[in-house]
């Protein structure tokens, strides 16, 4: 196998094919990764995938690498990047990343984000060589126990779009892409509000229930509203977990509410274009 490697826009494939390619390219990765077509479509649509900017690299007619690019305004993000084992360690990672960066600059993007699993030393080294700089560490949590939920009427269900719009009015809020308001309201799930000041977004699917975001009005912070809401959610949704998208500085809140931090963590990284 020594054919030329060529790239094509991911728009040539459907979500089910892209899910298979992504799973195939992640073979032997640090953390086991699989995804089906339905989940691929739901997840990356919420993250604002750009199929025309996402790339598949082919060799001898077979997909060998895949980069998922998501975009909002003049900001893009490398949402997933995987290379088949037979092409790893041959310099293709740097070649493919340079192509993605050049294309981002050509379309006028100002910033490019990504996340990398802590412990993926080769991936981290590659991104740092390409100019990406660590911004923060992202962590995840899961509930370790729960008590009987008693309906008191304090926690009310609302339209997720209402919560997203509330977050968008906070000009000082800077969240990871996965927790941003623009992502949250597009996911299947529910939103809740406590005392008209504390909000939570719960994403649901047949496999798990996940707390995707907790938000408290700036004027109500430091008064225990977040802790009360997260405790109520813990009771109502046994086994509740979060995505690995929580800024590390929020860990004390979750740990104090009966959650355990997951072993997998990520660095959020930024390249200014």
Annotate the PLM regions.
Residues 56, 62-70, 77-82, 193-215:
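Conserved beta-strand in the GNAT
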Residues 30-68, 167-193:
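Active-site rim helix/loop that mediates acceptor-substrate recognition in acyltransferases
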Residues 90, 94, 106, 118-136, ...:
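Conserved active-site alpha-helix within GNAT-family acetyltransferase domains
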Residues 104-115, 235-247:
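Conserved GNAT acetyl-CoA-binding A-motif
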Residues 83, 89-102, 125-129, 222-235:
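Conserved acetyl-CoA-binding loop-helix of GNAT-fold acetyltransferases
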Residues 130-203:
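Amide-forming acyltransferase catalytic core, primarily the GNAT-like/NAT-type
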Residues 4-20, 152-167:
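A short beta-loop-alpha structural element at the N-terminal edge
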Residues 110, 117-119, 139-163, 246-247, ...:
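C-terminal "cap" of GNAT-fold acetyltransferases
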